[in-house]
């Protein structure tokens, strides 16, 4: 396995670790509605950071974006909006299925759809089947899916042992939302594929290969921001128990406390895709679809590890922890299989 591929896998791991940890600061926010908290964090992660970093990277910010036709920018934006819809469905999936089943189904579907649809759309899926390296990477995707399933099973055992139940368990509604979440969340993978002309243009301007994907985030995350912020602002305006004015009428120290924590959560959320871009840059072009598989499987892996570190599994008993550990090992094996396949 080459050093470039190894570093690509490593940066995807770092990005996934940030994704697994990003909600921790949000949990410390006090006396704010989820909608206000999510909006503040989202403004930082989807608007401020993408724009600021792109302004630093590009020699001429406005000239870069105005150089693209609407036919180039629109698919990137719409796939970003698609991914934003997946974000909203993710929370509803947890509500009706519970954390473990919801995450397992949603992540499993988005891993498959986001990973395999890209080479199918690009018309080179047959190359993957007909080459040794391609077959090896596909095997890695299958093993990763098995690993996600094992971790999901561990979560179910933990919830059963600790008496944790879904907020409003509804299997039929939850499954529909989980499938929708999985499909729509793959929009980020499709957006990255559609944004290749933007990456190439950034490279032509002399942007370092590690950073060429970052300017496209202005458009991708702009699509996601409109969906997420629109959802939050509509709820803040229409739901009687929610009030943006009330949330910002608290004592000044508490407002500052909440804003800083929400901004930190937004920063950590953005960093997952900052390092995703670094990892994506190190993956061989013919296997760039594997970036999504690495990100999502490492997200599940890091989520399990973070749960152990935060002692969330302390009262779950030995069996759930053993199953979780097995699932984490399987995901690590999957990453190595994919790495070997890409090296071939």
From Swiss-Prot:
Molecular function in Gene Ontology: rhamnose transmembrane transporter activity; symporter activity
Listed transmembrane segments: 4-24, 38-58, 68-88, 101-121, 137-157, 175-195, 214-234, 259-279, 290-310, 323-343
Catalysed conversion reaction: L-rhamnopyranose(in) + H(+)(in) = L-rhamnopyranose(out) + H(+)(out)
Principal location: membrane
GO CC term (a single one): plasma membrane
Similarity comment: Belongs to the L-rhamnose transporter (TC 2.A.7.6) family.
Functional summary from the UniProt entry: Uptake of L-rhamnose across the cytoplasmic membrane with the concomitant transport of protons into the cell (symport system).
Protein's UniProt name: L-rhamnose-proton symporter
Originating species: Escherichia coli O45:K1 (strain S88 / ExPEC)
Designated gene of the protein: rhaT
